[in-house]
Amino acid sequence: LFRPPERFTLETTARINPAANTKLSGLYLSNGVFCTQCEAQGFRRITWYLDRPDVLARFRVRLEGPQAMLPVLLSNGNPISRGTFGDGWHYATWEDPYPKPAYLFALVAGDLAVRRDHWRTRSGRAVELAIYTEPAFIDQTAHAMESLKRAMRWDEDRFGLEYDLDVYNIVAVGDFNFGAMENKGLNIFNTA
């Protein structure tokens, strides 16, 4: 495409091997959980992209996997569809309506336990809150949930900022290269 129109949609297909990715950068598989770490330039380990903080795009992500092995399928943004297909497979489609740089892209898929709650914004909009972790750590997430709600209240009180997505997910996993990554709508933390 040597002379693309001013506006167009580009769709790509990439083949990667997350199980062989031992750098914990990009998309990797560790202890049965698929996870991403895209800062600072990890997204380019997933697919070709202009991986710079000044290049912003909206992302729509469809995750597919065997439901027995990967019952949780998460990405940034709002869930827009879920379903099943084939013999024991399922999918989840996520759409982030706000442009963001690639280093804030996030994806997690695995067999994780969850603690759920909700938040009502100052304007009355409901936000679903969820903290996912390996089952052995789920009892340690109550404080994290209360901290999340206090932080959301602080943002509203201090800056007048309401959270603008329908869900806010946090994932804590054992094998995460950074201490934390504050991807919008899907924060990822190390359990250590």
PLM segments and residue spans:
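Intramembrane catalytic core of multi-pass membrane enzymes that act on lipidic substrates
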Residues: 28-33, 43
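Hydrophobic helix-coil surface modules that form long, contiguous segments used
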Residues: 35-41, 49-192
